[in-house]
A protein has these predicted regions:
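Positively charged n-region of N-terminal signal peptides that target proteins for export
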Residues: 1-5
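Small/flexible residues
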Residues: 6-7, 237
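Bacterial N-terminal signal peptides
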Residues: 7-17
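Exported/periplasmic ABC-transporter solute-binding proteins
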Residues: 22-274
């Protein structure tokens, strides 16, 4: 009898542990969302409010995060781009929690204030190689980009919306993390790169002051132009689930759409609600 009671206690404890583990959240995907939202206060605020913990926040990029979700390795993926047709066919659901711009950055001493889409396309396909050809100084253009084979949303969206699907030019400097693209640009007066506007906040102040975002087609990336889509490289920030959100993933998504969650989004990005 005593052994039976002990066994029942052990079983109850085991079920409690398993239940607690089942409540944990795991995330993989966009570094824009991971760094600029989850690690910028959202995960901690959600833990405080719900008791549900994030045991993993991995940031391999939107494409790889979605694949991890499809493989059953995580409960929640992040995508800083719209879902592709083939992803929707796999019954994935994306919930928009905010908006972002892929901003074009140059060194602060660069006199160029705006580029057209065609000029930007020419730079990143290697057709335009000198700043004087786009209204700047007589100096070679030194573009950098994220790693082109990374399947990251910024690389794919920029290629689709700016390059019209054309291949990137040969010889682009490829950098693993978008934050490090800005760090590199701060040290290269003739440089240019395209990075999430929201991630600028993660760059040290002394380096951040050495770069500037420029207009695209004379439209600056700001709350109004990004939310309306007037800025060419605007994009939604999605939390992605396999089917309709449920369980801890649903709780977190619901939290991100509350006033508290949207205030966290607004620190670095454009919230869904004004």
């Amino acid at each position: 009898m005593k052994l039976r009671k002990i066994a029942l206690v052990v079983l109850a404890l085991a079920m409690t542990v398993l239940s607690a583990q089942a409540e944990d959240l795991t995330y993989s995907g966009s570094s824009t969302i991971g760094t600029g939202i989850l690690k910028a206060g959202a995960a901690d605020a959600f833990i405080q409010k719900s008791g549900i913990n994030f045991t993993a926040i991995d940031q391999p990029g939107s494409g790889k995060g979605i694949q991890a979700l499809l493989d059953g390795k995580v409960l929640l993926a992040g995508a800083s781009r719209p879902l592709k047709a083939e992803e929707k066919q796999k019954k994935l659901i994306g919930t928009t929690i905010g908006y972002d711009a892929i901003a074009v950055f140059v060194h602060k001493d660069n006199p160029v204030k705006s580029l057209t889409k065609e000029q930007l396309k020419g730079i990143f396909t290697g057709q335009i190689k000198n700043w004087k050809d786009v209204g700047g100084n007589d100096a070679p253009i030194a573009p950098n980009t994220e790693i082109l084979t990374s399947k990251r949303a910024t690389v794919e969206m920029f290629q689709e919306l700016v390059l019209d699907g054309a291949p990137y030019g040969a010889g682009l400097k490829q950098i693993d993390l978008p934050r490090d693209q800005i760090v590199d640009l701060a040290r290269v007066p003739n440089g240019i790169c395209s990075v999430s506007l929201g991630l600028l906040a993660s760059v040290p102040a002394d380096l951040k002051s050495k770069v500037k975002a420029i207009a695209l087609n004379n439209i600056e990336p700001n709350d109004n132009s990004v939310r309306s889509g007037a800025y060419l490289i605007s994009r939604p920030l999605l939390l992605v689930t396999p089917g309709l959100p449920k369980g801890p993933a649903k709780e977190f998504i619901s939290f991100m759409l509350t006033a508290e969650g949207q205030n966290i989004v607004a620190k670095n990005f454009v919230p869904v609600r004004k």
